[in-house]
């Protein structure tokens, strides 16, 4: 790590900072908190890295490919912008801090997401002891500068022990924010965002550490009552943790709670689910998803799937494929398993050859794309309330991407529109997190 430091006061006044986020919506929120902290100390945020003197990279460690992508980005930025200071934070740096510190291109490493630690890392003459777990909440995020949708982080960390997951090692135990703090932040963000996404690492466990009567359903009910003009969307949530009260809120909200659920599946084989240390069976997942789909219509439905987990046989893969084909998914995030240091799965025998795992992942992605395209086609001619993300694009409540026709529209607003056109042809390729592109329809103002 480059430890050269220049003169100056231990603050960020005058620093021009460019941010890059890898990974999940929780990371997007954390980057915004870093930005807000730095701006409060006098730093300037820039959208062009060529204008920056410091870059903050908020990394992801969900897969081996995610770690590699972050390190490649460090080297590429250093090569193209040799005068740029590089500060690395996030989940990858939490688990691989020593590796980043050994990289000569890196000027500062923050093992985690603490925005104060990031701000101090930008001022190189200040040294801060590393912490494994930053506090949850405490400072309210006023807005999401980089998008028309706002991120509303309600908790961090996870108490489950899935054998494949390194994110829980990086994020620590589940910690919920107080409801009043979340409501106050939602009111601030609602001033500039018409849609707020409830995010975290394990939002289905929201409130378990806060005492009786506080849970995700009660929080959502309070948000819907407090901010009736805002559309709320749930981030990733386990299917078995969606209670009937939450379904009733979604069904009866008139779209104020977006009809969209991302419910991690991981595998359709009970043998593999046991090896993954998941807490549900294939049938429990299947039954709950079908109950949800029967109650909510239309419904954008996504899932995470891991292909090629250690010990996964052809028949296990076939069971996963069959379950995907049975359930009404509209998109999938699929990626081949990769060993994550410190996880139980990294020590399991019977690893599936990489080329077989990659082939299985590609096959499942193609099924997901076919399902998504068919779902998009079924929505043509329907009315949808679209969150305007830019003057030419938006997102429906059921998670369809749309191109906007007609007059330019104001980002950060909601508008009823008629869906039209044919879903754009998609490819089954995916990035480090296995995310496939969403189908794209066209939309025009409703008559």
Q: Where are the predicted features?
A:
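Terminal RNA-binding accessory module
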Residues: 14, 336, 347-447
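Residue-level signal for inorganic ion chemistry
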Residues: 56, 91, 198, 234, ...
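Active-site proximal loops enriched in glycine and acidic residues that flank catalytic Cys/His/Asp
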Residues: 21, 200, 236, 265-267, ...
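Conserved SAM/AdoMet-binding glycine-rich loop
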Residues: 86-87, 95-96, 191-315
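Short acidic, glycine/proline-rich loop/turn micro-motifs
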Residues: 273-276, 344-348
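Contiguous mid-protein beta-loop-alpha structural module that forms a pocket-lining wall or clamp
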Residues: 312, 328-329
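Proteins enriched for Cys/Gly/acidic motifs involved in redox and nucleic-acid/cofactor modification
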Residues: 1-206, 245, 261, 282-294, ...
